[in-house]
Amino acid sequence: MNNFGEDFIFGGATAAYQAEGATKEDGKGPCIWDEYLKKEGRFTGDTASDFYHKYKEDLKFSRKFGVNGIRISIAWSRVIPDGKGEVNPKGLKFYSDLIDECIKNNVEPFVTLHHFDTPLTLFKDGDWLNRNNIDYFVRFAKVCFEALGDRVKKWITFNEAWAVAQNGYIIGNFPPSIKYDIPKAAQSMHNMMVAHAKVVELYKSMNLDGEIGIVHTLEGKYPITDSKEDKEAAYLDYMISNKFMLDACFKGEYPKETEKTINEIMSKNGGELKIYDGDLEVLKKASSKIDFLGMNYYSSHFLKAYEGESRIHHNGTGEKGTSIFALKGIGERVNNPEVPTTDWDWPIYPKGLHDMLVRIKNEYPNYKKIYVTENGMGYKDDFKDGKIDDTPRIDYINKHLEAILKAKNEGVVVKGYFVWSLMDVLSWSNGYNKRYGLFYVDFKTQNRYAKKSAYWFKRISYEKKLIDFSDIEY
C-alpha cells in the first residue's frame, strides 16, 4: 500500500537556538551555546534564520507548501533567563503568539521543552550531571504547560538525550567539550530520563487536553562482518546509544541484561552508573503514560570489534572520509563500502529506519504511536538564478518515506514525518554551510526561496502518497 493515511503529518522541524536568533532580545538569558560559540569564534547563533522575527512568513510558506506540522522548541532561557528564577513574560508572549500563528495557518505545533539549550547558569552548575537540574526543568515545564497547554496538543520533553550526552562528553563537539568520558555521558542520560518521567507525570496530573512524548535519535547498529566479535561491538553500541534510554522510557526500568551491559561498559571506562532512591519508581510510573515516541533518524552505523583506547575525529567540515569513531569497551564505527555516505560521512541507509521502526513495535509493545520527528540530508545547496535543484535530497527523503511505508504495512503505527529542516538553519558544529531545509535561506538578507524539494513535498503532502519526483516542474 502506497498511502500514508489522511491523518498523517507531513511536517518540518526546527529548534529554537538553530532558527530563532534574537539571542539578546526581549529579556532572553544566555544558554550554553552563546558562550561556547563565542569562544570557538567560527560562527554564532545571534541571528540564525531570524525565525524570531520571520515566523509569520515561515508559517505562510509552510501552509503554501503543504507542511501541516511544525516542530518548534521553547528556549528555556527565553522563558526563565537563568533557568531557575523569575519568568520572563516577553519570552512567554513570543511563544504564545507563535502557537497562535501555527494554529491560524493549520500547521500543528509539536513543542519540545529541551533541544540542546540549557540556560548558561545551570550549565555552569553541572548541567544534567547536577540533579538539581531535574527540579528546575520540571518547574520550567509547568510554566510552559500553564501558559500554552490550552492550545498545544503535542509536547516533547527532550530532543535526543543521547546526542546531548555523546556530543558533550564523548565526541566533545558540544559544550562542555569533554572527550571520551562515557560514564559522564551515561549518567547525564539517566538523569535526563528521570527528568523526562517527572515531566510526563506532571503533564498527566494537570489534565490537559493533549499528548506528551519524547524524541530519541535512533541509529541502526550492524556488524561489518558476521564474526562474533563484530556482532558484539554492534550489540554494545546499540545498548548505550538506543536500548538504555528506550528501556527507561517504555519499560520504566533497566532490565538485567541492559543493566549488566551498561555497567560493564562503564567499568571498562573507569566509572559506574548511580541510580538514586526513587528514580526507578518514577521511571516505572511514567512508562505507561507516554503517548508517543518521536524518532530522529539520519543514518546507521557499521561496527567492528575494537580493543584500544577511545579515538574520535568528528567531520565538521564536509571533507568526506575523515571521520574516526572508536570507543573503548564498545567498538569502532567503520565504512561499509556498499553503503553511500554524505559529505559528512553519514551512511545513507534507509533500511536502518525500517528495521528500527519494526524493532520498536516488537520490543516495546506498549508503544502507542511513532512520529519520525527528524530525517533529512545535509547538502551544500547550489543557489542558481533564485532556484535550488536539490534532487539528491529528494531522493534521500523519498527512500526514507518508502521505508516508513514498508514499516506501516507491517503493522507499525507511524503517524507523521518531519523533514529536517523546515528552512535552512544553523548547524551546531558546521555553521551555515550544511543546509537541510525545504526552504533556502540567504543568511545575508534572510530571504527565503523554495527549493525543488519543497515543491515535491507539497505534492506528496496533498496526495498522501509518494510520487515520481522526475515529474516535478521547477
From Swiss-Prot:
Keywords: Glycosidase, Hydrolase. It comes from the Bacteria. The active site is at E160 (proton donor), E374 (nucleophile). One of its GO terms (biological process) is lactose catabolic process via tagatose-6-phosphate. InterPro entries: 6P-beta-galactosidase, Glyco_hydro_1, Glyco_hydro_1_AS, Glyco_hydro_1_N_CS, Glycoside_hydrolase_SF. The keyword Hydrolase applies. D-galactose 6-phosphate binds at Q18, H115, N159, E160, N296, S427, W428, K434, Y436. Pathway: Carbohydrate metabolism; lactose degradation; D-galactose 6-phosphate and beta-D-glucose from lactose 6-phosphate: step 1/1. It catalyses: a 6-phospho-beta-D-galactoside + H2O = D-galactose 6-phosphate + an alcohol. One of its GO terms (molecular function) is beta-glucosidase activity. Its EC number is 3.2.1.85. It holds the Pfam family Glyco_hydro_1. Gene3D superfamilies: Glycosidases. GO terms for cellular component: cytosol. Belongs to the glycosyl hydrolase 1 family. NCBIfam families: lacG, PRK13511.1. HAMAP family: LacG. This is 6-phospho-beta-galactosidase.
